[in-house]
């Protein structure tokens, strides 16, 4: 079995780690950073940029730069959370009803594909570090992700060419990283406020056992919402001052969003920051600049309601675990937003103790995922992880009532069966609608999918016995079966949401990813040969200036023509022209050898004029050494 990696696929940033012996290692990306922005950009030339390079060009390519797509993964376009989505790129309803994204040239991508591009980048970073192919991975998701979102994340891993060993809840992974060396039993809370989601989990840790007692959260609450609060404030203030609404200017909006995020981060350590965006727009009177100061107090007033929203899940998790805040031994902070002083203050106020600050909130989840990979592969022993399902799972019964079969916070993997019957006389088929949530009516909960059990013998209502079995695996993904106990007929399905990616779509995306990898390799070769061409043209032109009069007119003309031909072919942006450029490079390299000979002869003449002739002075030891060196070089040149 090859090495397995742990990946934190975040809304804002992603991170990859690996076990090395008993230690964990966070792997740096190509830019040398330990985290990678979860941003994918498609350029006009067809190039795909991931991470920091994608972020750098976002201002000028906002409509084709996809960020925070984790908020879309596994979601239907009609979901209520989609209404308040504020992004510069196009989000639309795919045929399945899922929320997908679209470029300006109408190329369509599922959020799982965008996630796969980021996972691929993590995979490549790990392979570059290890020097070997990586196939296996543990990927983390927010604890409050539903079945559709978990399945969509697993699909992203498959598209990226990874065998997903396990889907692990982010707070649980963080607890693993925090508590692996803790021997004495105690209860902890993991408060995870990231870029797009909020989770809180309560765990008991002791003697290598990590048992999740309860989990709660909000899959649409995170740093993006804090940024949007600042953006709205800046837009309103600018409109008051200048009478111009910038909401419909994508480039201005992107600049403001970046400035808002930067200001938010700075105010975690400073009391005041200045936002200065020159030439943000223009009107008849000339260019307009956005320049204003933002204090920490003002930021806190803008986002206070968001911080307050994290308290309700904390209360619910404590209730579900049957604990009070005073019974919590440690509060572990995870996610970049937990660096905000007001968040730390609120957590301290709620739990009555200073939060533990000994883990890196940006890296701890990936480290925990790497530990889980080590557990699965047998590299980490004597550790048992008992996670829970975050939401109740059940079916729709008579009258549209939601009947849970597996209650929330049930330890997984788990399996449960219940017998139901028909609602009408002589009913020969039943449709099983599977829902996930906590509301009393099925329609108010998330419909995960449905299937039919047919061929039931006609009988009075209530007599047939239909056994419905729910099986939730360690990934938190459900498998459901229905069986007619009289006939033994059974229908099994792995829950696939009413939307979701079909196997054919996943296979197509896997193939596209493989083809794109080949194209990326061609593009890399193309860039390398263009750089080689530019360098050769520069050095040849420099040599022509200095030594052009030392070669024959015919040779000089041939070299100049070759330089012009290489310049012309190098203007191409078509990656298929790499071989043509390489041929011109080879041709110019061969012709410019004449210049090399001229350079050598000039150097030889200069040496002779300075007294270092081949005759030398037999009575001068230093000249004998020079004479010997000169003869060696001369002989080598003759042998060429």
From Swiss-Prot:
Compositional bias ranges of the Basic and acidic residues kind: 539-556, 618-640
Region (Disordered) residue spans: 537-556, 596-640
Position of the signal peptide: none
InterPro entries documented for this protein: ATPase_NBD, Chaperone_DnaK, Heat_shock_70_CS, HSP70_C_sf, HSP70_peptide-bd_sf, Hsp_70_fam
Keyword terms: ATP-binding, Chaperone, Nucleotide-binding, Phosphoprotein, Stress response
Composition-biased stretches (Polar residues): 600-617
Superkingdom, taxonomy of origin: Bacteria
Modified residues (Phosphothreonine): 197
NCBIfam families per the UniProt record, alphabetical: PRK00290.1, PRK05183.1, prok_dnaK
Family: Belongs to the heat shock protein 70 family.
Protein name: Chaperone protein DnaK
Native organism: Wolbachia pipientis wMel
């Amino acid at each position: 079995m090859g090495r397995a990696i742990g990946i934190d696929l975040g809304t804002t940033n992603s991170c990859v780690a690996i076990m090395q012996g008993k230690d964990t290692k966070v792997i740096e990306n190509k830019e040398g950073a330990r985290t990678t922005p979860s941003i994918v950009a498609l350029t006009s030339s067809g190039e795909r940029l991931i991470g920091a390079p994608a972020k750098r060009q976002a201002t000028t390519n906002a409509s084709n730069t996809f960020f925070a797509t984790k908020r879309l993964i596994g979601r239907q376009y009609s979901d209520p959370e989609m209404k308040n989505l504020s992004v510069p790129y196009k989000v639309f309803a795919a045929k399945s009803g899922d929320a997908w994204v679209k470029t300006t040239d109408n190329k369509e991508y599922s959020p799982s594909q965008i996630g796969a591009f980021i996972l691929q980048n993590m995979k490549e970073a790990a392979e570059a570090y290890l020097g070997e192919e990586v196939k296996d991975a543990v990927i983390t998701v927010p604890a409050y992700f539903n079945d559709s979102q978990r399945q969509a994340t697993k699909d992203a891993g498959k598209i990226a060419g990874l065998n997903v060993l396990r889907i692990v809840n982010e707070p649980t992974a963080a607890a693993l990283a925090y508590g692996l060396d803790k021997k004495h039993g105690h209860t902890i809370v993991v408060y995870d406020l990231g870029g797009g989601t909020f989770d809180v989990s309560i765990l008991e840790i002791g003697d290598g056992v990590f048992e999740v007692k309860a989990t709660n959260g909000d899959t649409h609450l995170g740093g993006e919402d804090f940024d949007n609060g600042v953006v709205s404030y800046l837009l309103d203030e600018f409109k008051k001052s200048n009478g111009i609404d910038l909401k419909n200017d994508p480039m201005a909006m992107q600049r403001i969003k970046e400035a808002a995020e930067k200001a938010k981060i700075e105010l975690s350590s400073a009391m005041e920051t200045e936002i200065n965006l020159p030439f943000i727009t223009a009107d008849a009177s000339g260019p307009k600049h956005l320049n204003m100061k933002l204090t920490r107090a003002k930021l806190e007033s803008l986002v206070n309601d968001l911080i307050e929203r994290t308290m309700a899940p904390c209360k619910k998790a404590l209730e579900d675990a049957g604990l009070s805040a005073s019974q919590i031994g440690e509060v572990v902070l995870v996610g970049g937003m937990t660096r905000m002083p007001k968040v730390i203050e609120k957590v301290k106020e709620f739990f009555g103790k200073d939060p533990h600050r000994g883990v890196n909130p940006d890296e701890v989840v990936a480290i925990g995922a790497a530990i889980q990979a080590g557990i699965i592969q047998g590299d980490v022993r004597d550790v048992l992880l008992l996670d829970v399902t975050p939401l109740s799972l059940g079916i729709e019964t008579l009258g549209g009532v939601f009947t849970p079969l597996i209650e929330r916070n049930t330890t997984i993997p788990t399996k449960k069966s219940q017998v139901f019957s028909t609602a009408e006389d002589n009913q020969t088929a039943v449709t099983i609608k599977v829902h996930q949530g906590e509301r009393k009516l099925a329609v108010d909960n998330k419909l995960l999918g449905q299937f039919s059990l047919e061929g039931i013998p006609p009988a009075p209502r209530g007599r047939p016995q239909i056994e419905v079995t729910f099986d939730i695996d360690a990934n938190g993904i459900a498998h459901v079966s229905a069986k007619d106990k009289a006939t033994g007929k059974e229908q099994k399905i792995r829950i696939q949401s009413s939307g979701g990616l079909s196997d054919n779509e996943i296979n197509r995306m896997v193939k596209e990813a493989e083809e794109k990898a080949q194209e990326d390799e061609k593009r890399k070769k193309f860039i390398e040969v263009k750089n080689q061409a530019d360098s050769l043209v520069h050095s040849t032109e420099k040599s022509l200036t200095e030594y052009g009069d030392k070669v024959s007119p015919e040779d000089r003309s041939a070299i100049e023509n070759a330089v012009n031909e290489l310049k012309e072919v190098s203007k191409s942006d078509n990656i298929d022209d790499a071989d043509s450029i390489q041929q011109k490079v080879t041709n110019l390299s061969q012709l410019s050898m004449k210049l090399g000979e001229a350079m050598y002869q000039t150097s030889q003449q200069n040496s002779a004029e300075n007294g270092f002739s081949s005759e030398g002075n037999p009575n001068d030891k230093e000249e004998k050494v020079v004479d010997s060196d000169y003869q060696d070089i001369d002989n080598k040149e003759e042998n060429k």
